[in-house]
Amino acid sequence: DSVYFTQWSDPDLGTYTDDYVGSDVDLSFGYVYNGNRLDGVFNGIFNLPVPAGGYDFLQGPADNMDLDGDGDSTEFLGMTSFAYFGAGSAIDDPDLSSYEGTLQWFNLMEGFLPRPAYPTQIPFSDPSTGLETKYALSGDPTSGAGWIDGVQLPPGDRRMVMNTGPFKLKVGE
């Protein structure tokens, strides 16, 4: 009941210094898109339109719990939280060379800011609503509605963390 799966990515899309990331909660999907209409790599070198990329939990782990009370304990978890960090920002990479960094990663897996480290947990706050959320950047970048990347930070080098859990991992699974 305390296992998490995490998909971490440093999704350098073309020129790494002009990226945005986001999450689609309903699709359990994390994505990267360009912060500028043109990109030095795709437009300048290949003469191509700027692409986007995505990460999906095609099928999350069996939760081995009956969360909705229907008697079925083999339901599957989707993305249960999404976090991000921007290089050089206040929300940046956890410390990779210390135990403190492990506690920071645990916070990210549970959908909280990495610092201060666990057991202290500070939630992400959606600037468009003022509400706490476990899904950072879950707005719609096409319409500009909700919390989208670019509101708090300019385009830049991003990392994203998609999580699913907690769930029970049975022996032999």
Where are these regions (language model features)?
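Extracellular/surface-associated beta-sandwich interaction domains
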Residues: D1-E173
